């Protein structure tokens, strides 16, 4: 598998997680609709599925990991930022095959692609603190 396939999986998963956060629709339905509506060529679909279902299943647990490092209440965090933080925290806590620096770099790129102008700085700061508490340097 190429790194770009995982990057594309993260890209797609961020969009699908955002949709799930907004609608709370069935994750399996979101996955199927996403595969129909989006170009998934070159996407690691197994990784996409793991990220989407993993974040949905462990959402509250993931929030508890990064919420202490937020500068505002979780409810006030932009939904795109929240999707990225949940995805990255899932990778940091549940995917030992991905180095922490890769997780942070990918999250920064997702924030640059999808979120507000300075969101990448916010995401970087929160995840850096998460890594320190997980002792994953």
Curated annotation (Swiss-Prot):
UniProt-listed Pfam families: NusB (PF01029)
Which keywords does the record carry? RNA-binding, Transcription, Transcription antitermination, Transcription regulation
Per the record's keyword annotation, is Iron included, yes or no?
A: no
> Can you tell which superkingdom this protein's organism belongs to?
Bacteria
Keyword Transcription listed? The answer is yes
Q: Name one GO biological process term.
A: transcription antitermination
Alphabetical list of InterPro entries matching this protein: NusB-like_sf (IPR035926), NusB_fam (IPR011605), NusB_RsmB_TIM44 (IPR006027)
Report the GO terms under cellular component: cytosol
The molecular function terms of the Gene Ontology recorded here are:
RNA binding
Q: Which family does it belong to?
A: Belongs to the NusB family.
Q: Which PANTHER family match?
A: ANTITERMINATION NUSB DOMAIN-CONTAINING PROTEIN, N UTILIZATION SUBSTANCE PROTEIN B-RELATED
Q: What does this protein do?
A: Involved in transcription antitermination. Required for transcription of ribosomal RNA (rRNA) genes. Binds specifically to the boxA antiterminator sequence of the ribosomal RNA (rrn) operons.
What's the protein here called? Transcription antitermination protein NusB
Which organism is this protein's natural source? Aeromonas salmonicida (strain A449)
Q: Cite the source lineage.
A: Bacteria, Pseudomonadati, Pseudomonadota, Gammaproteobacteria, Aeromonadales
Q: Which gene encodes it?
A: nusB
């Amino acid at each position: 598998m190429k790194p770009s396939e995982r990057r594309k999986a993260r890209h797609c998963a961020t969009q699908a997680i955002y949709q799930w956060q907004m609608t709370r629709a069935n994750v399996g339905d979101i996955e199927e609709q996403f595969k129909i509506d989006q170009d998934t060529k070159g996407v690691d679909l197994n990784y996409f599925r793991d990220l989407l279902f993993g974040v949905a299943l462990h959402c509250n647990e993931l929030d508890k990991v990064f919420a202490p490092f937020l500068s505002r209440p979780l409810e006030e965090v932009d939904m795109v930022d929240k999707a990225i933080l949940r995805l990255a925290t899932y990778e940091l806590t549940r995917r030992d095959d991905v180095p922490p620096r890769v997780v942070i770099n990918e999250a920064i790129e997702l924030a640059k692609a999808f979120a507000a102008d300075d969101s990448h700085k916010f995401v970087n700061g929160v995840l850096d603190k998460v890594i320190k508490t997980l002792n994953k340097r």
